[in-house]
């Protein structure tokens, strides 16, 4: 299992949720997003929306599986715009 904490950037808007799900869905690993003790499957649009992510909050990305390390890096890059 791999984890990475990031701060949700100002540019992350609800319209980016579909792109986030598409990015997460490229991996076979289970990817979860954790915000303020709420956890959601990163491959679920409704799950991500339920997190109600806001600029400046701490987000923990958790991945388990064969490609977990690459999934964490890719998800981090999605949020940081790298």
Language-model segments: residues:
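Intrinsic-disorder/low-complexity, polar/charged segments enriched in Ser/Thr/Lys/Arg/Asp/Glu/Gln
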Residues: 1-5, 58-60
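Compact, glycine-rich, soluble single-domain proteins
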Residues: 5-41, 46, 50-51
